[in-house]
Regions:
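Active-site mouth loops of central-metabolism enzymes
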Residues: 43-54, 138-144
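Extended substrate/RNA-proximal surfaces in nucleic-acid metabolism proteins
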Residues: 64, 77-193, 248-257, 264-272
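Short, positively charged and aromatic/hydrophobic N-terminal segments
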Residues: 13, 21-27, 32
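His/Asp/Glu-enriched short active-site or ligand-binding loop at hydrolase and phosphoryl-transfer sites
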Residues: 190-203
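Short acidic/histidine-rich active-site segments
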Residues: 223-237
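Histidine/acidic-residue-rich catalytic or RNA/ligand-binding cores of hydrolases
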Residues: 49-53, 83, 174-181, 201-215, ...
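Histidine-centered catalytic micro-motifs
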Residues: 38-49, 165-169, 229
Length: 272
């Protein structure tokens, strides 16, 4: 019998192999680029409208299988084509906080819509979420100048539920990282080191220089970062390989990487 290796089968094989690899390495120090951190704060489900058909329960099962303790469900805001409507995010307030033994945080990756930092979710909905990631995407945000983009991020991060700036390494949206980190420290917001951006098949351009600038500014101002997979689906949940390599290459203190403790991150969420 001939077996055809479809794209889905290939993804399933990669997912299984990755799970086994992490399980094998779960008791080793993360010196080879796949850090066994405790949580992944940036994961997407079918409600993001693209890239996956997995559910929150699917994600919890996968997270449990690779030894994570906590995940953040952060689907794209409603301005993203095909993403969940406002009612989806509103109802997350009633979702179970634990699945398959994994602590679940419910958030959103809200779209910044303009240079004033307007988000695509109303305050009443943001208030019921555990935290919010703010990001720039096309076509929901038109790339501006360095000053305009930085101004937009700073305005958006003023909302008390905003705790992470997502993939601000994107070369399409130039940013003044020094000014951004100073503001982020003031407003208790983390800059994300996004593994998907740094991966060889990333689509945000050559972000290595921008990531270096982010880490240098955060180190200078003693401000922590958070690593994320930005996984759309199961295959890359908890995969921080390239983000971890950036941390090591740029000699960034591991003490400033919040993924090492879910308690530290949960405490950080209470600030502001």
């Amino acid at each position: 019998m001939k077996i055809t290796c479809t794209d889905k089968l290939k993804k399933d094989i990669v997912s299984i192999a990755y799970s086994l690899f992490l399980r094998y390495n779960s008791n080793r120090n993360f010196m080879k680029g796949l850090a066994m951190y405790q949580f992944d704060p940036h994961i997407h489900t079918i409600s993001s409208g693209h890239g996956t058909n997995c559910t929150i329960t699917d994600i919890a099962k996968q997270a449990a299988s690779i030894g994570l303790l906590m995940v953040g469900i952060t689907d794209h805001g409603p301005a993203t084509p095909g993403a969940g409507r406002a009612s989806y995010f509103r109802n997350l307030a009633y979702a179970p906080k634990t699945r398959c033994g994994i602590e679940i945080l419910y958030g959103a990756e809200a779209n910044i819509l303009d240079s004033n930092g307007t988000l695509d979710l109303e305050d009443e909905i943001l208030e019921v979420l555990d935290y919010v990631i703010i990001s720039m995407h096309q076509p929901t945000y038109k790339p501006g100048t360095t000053e305009e983009n930085t101004f937009a991020y700073i305005n958006a991060m003023k909302h008390p539920k905003v705790k992470i700036i997502g993939h601000c390494d994107d070369v399409k949206f130039p940013v003044d990282y020094e000014a951004l980190v100073i503001a982020a420290k003031h407003y208790d917001v983390l800059l994300e080191i996004n593994n998907a951006s740094l991966s060889p098949d990333g689509y945000r351009g050559d972000v290595s220089g921008n990531v270096k600038s982010i880490l240098e500014a955060c180190k200078k101002h003693n401000h922590p970062v958070v690593l994320s997979s930005d996984s759309h689906g199961l295959a890359n949940i908890g995969n921080f390989q390239y983000a971890f390599e950036a941390i090591k290459t740029n000699h960034f203190p591991e003490s400033l990487v919040l993924n090492s403790s879910k308690e530290l991150f949960n405490t950080f969420l209470q600030n502001k």
